[in-house]
Amino acid sequence: MIGPKALPVTIISGYLGAGKTTLVNNALRKANGLKLAILVNEFGNLAIDEDLIIAQDENMISLAGGCICCSYGNDMLLSLKELTSLDNKPDHIILEASGVAIPSAIESSISLITECFTESIVSIIDCEQIQDQLNDKYIADTVISQIQSADIILANKADLIKSDSPFHNWKENHEVLNKAILVSHSDVDLDIFLGITRHYWSPNTIIKKADKGHTNKFWSKVFFPYALVDPKKLSEALTQSNLFLVRAKGHVSGPDAKIYEVQSVGHRSYIKLANKEKLPGLVLIGTKEHMDFDLLNQGLKEFGSFSA
């Protein structure tokens, strides 16, 4: 179980030129009060848009909206611990890996400390380049490792691929990439990229959030768990691959009558004790491309329903 004060870390991976930096800049522009900490190996490797920068010193860049960018150099874990010890702690840490880094190795390092946990690994691929990269004997192993360790795969630069391109058929028949989300200019809702933010989780807004919906690529629904649901079993059920859920987050009343926060992203799930009293309910997000509500109801029926 995740500690109640542990900070979530999203690892961004992807080969050189896939669109990682653009994804970071988009996240900063969409933060809307969420305090993000961007962690990079060297400042020179991340081109933060100038209009987002408020101040800069040797170790930290102050950004609009209370966000910050830090360089971790040779000691990533020390930098993570320093972020968690700030008086004004970030809500979420985004760690941009280098283009040739293996994200599962970064995740293993993060697991050595209790102050943070890996919330998700997001891998970006370049729609135009991915087939050539997977056939390149020098880089294929790296690209495959980045893809296989991902909870969410963003297939970027989709606007450059024609509708009749063989890429689409190749993607759908690929064992892993068939779940990739097509995006352009690394533009994706923050709900999808980082998870549903803390601002949405009051009793008065949980249903409004799901009703609001997303772009035409996604659906969202509120799931109402029964009383005294086992949070571990529910979190495991949410990661069933045939449900094609992108993310789920919410609260349940456990068998011990305590309130637990339950989250899932891709094949990853985790639970923690809620630090405040919350009403039971989860928001589920999936892609319309793989929408099957009959299958969803069947997979989750022992835990609750989609009507109050």
Model feature map: region roles:
Residues 145-280, 288-308:
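C-terminal accessory "lid"/substrate-recognition subdomains
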Residues 2-136, 141:
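Nucleotide-state-sensitive switch-loop elements of NTP-binding domains
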Residues 284:
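Flexible loop/N-cap segments at domain edges
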